[in-house]
């Protein structure tokens, strides 16, 4: 074996002051891992301090006390000693006493054990402790003050000491610490296990307090660490460590049938033999690796010590990772198939509000169109390119083209669950939901709606249709819609009169078109122009599907035409449109938007009233929670009430146009919700 030259053992063989002086003078020339020889007086002082702390058990138990014993009686019994703590448990008839030091504890045991107290024979003994730890793999140069500072960081300690060699007086690389509470000891064990200290990692394990005896604290086992990872020759290892003394146990660490431990345990018959081998063989080279020999915790045989070290190494590896594995990018992308996540991502698209956006895109747009989400995914993709996931996951994250499939999957999810559970007002059929979740070219919005429907006069906030179609195509649309501002056929002078107000009306209804796209009487095939033909109210299949819905409040009167939008009660927004009298005895009109545009073109007061009407229009969620009975009462009140006269008159309208009259009646009323 190749041994280190000038080891600590050789340095310690010298005697007298000259040896200590020579050791101190040679200290700068010492190689790494070597320590200077100590003066014999220093060696004696260290050993004396170690033995004093070893026997410094100052907590005692006084058992078999009378049932009515008090703490005052225990103080009087032990009046010759300095008590630091005293507690009497009357149920157990036991007193827990802490004295000044271990010497007083030993004296009290010898004096009061089997002492007769009020007719009872007392039993006095040392308190057992379950907060004792042994810390191994400490640096040889670690001082007692450094060790105390290390362990005191985790709680109040009862005592701590290092184990020194009886020959050289140097530390053996392990020590003991007893905490006041077991919680402190458990925390220290968890934190110190695997902590790097110098060139090695610390080990912390529980110890039996009965092993704290001068003849038992010196270990007989050595840990051979930093072996080659592929080293598996136990016979060669046994031969290497049998040159000075033959070991009684030598085995490589085998974890679950593999030689992946990288260390071994060797046990000798005496602690002196183990110390001699450690001084000579520490730092030898095996298969090109310089191994490290350190003392194991004393008390246990070599086989048990090996099992404890394997378990400790497994615990160190498990502490470096979380309880759950980290998800890879592929799993993150697959999570988008979850319907709950789709609902969150598409929530602004399904229930957009006419509110001024604070950050990101307009509230009528989906979160998937927000630049923050794609940029975050791309940033995360770049961070994961060097991981073990591979190039496939990076390409998946960088390619956002599959994202349009999210809305299609959401539609399938909604259609699969349609009409499963009838609500208070019945569930809308799938034919009604499809227009609300239409996938197609986006609506070219002109303005951005502010708070309460205020129109901010900005143009072309949304890119052209081709751009948004490439950007997932998530917006609702009108089928075959003409570009905004383009006149329909037959407008003539009416179009010229309304040219000043069309831009305002477009701004006011840009956010409302999302909600009015399924209103009856609204032209579905063209823009909001005057002479468009009113299409049929509703296909027969939709009416049949609507009649099949069950409602706890029964069917509404036939005179009231309800909206086909499942989330919006039209009677609360524009009640005159729902009345059958609005369409009786007159030729077909141009629809809701045309009537409102005509009203706007007549004057600023009507325009102000219209803006108030739109401003008081709540969002979809508010109407989804409103009571249907309350809405029916409102509809019946509109049926009975007649149009009220007022200062606002509609110029250029026919007297028989009762639909416009009902619209003006509603615009004048101030509703309080």
Curated annotation (Swiss-Prot):
UniProt biased composition (Gly residues): 1-17
Main location per the UniProt record: nucleus
Chain intervals with Low complexity compositional bias: 18-29, 499-512
Family annotation (Pfam families): RRM_1 (PF00076)
Top-rank taxon, per record: Eukaryota
Tissue: Expressed throughout embryogenesis. Detected at low levels in adult lung, brain and kidney, but not in the other tissues tested.
Domain RRM, chain residue ranges per copy: 58-129, 131-209, 220-298
One GO CC term on file: cytoplasm
A GO MF label: RNA binding
Localization: Nucleus; Cytoplasm
Compositionally biased residues, Polar residues: 529-549
Function, in words: May bind single-stranded nucleic acids.
Subunit structure and binding partners: Interacts with PTBP1 and RAVER1.
Protein name: Ribonucleoprotein PTB-binding 2
Originating species: Mus musculus (Mouse)
Gene that encodes it: Raver2
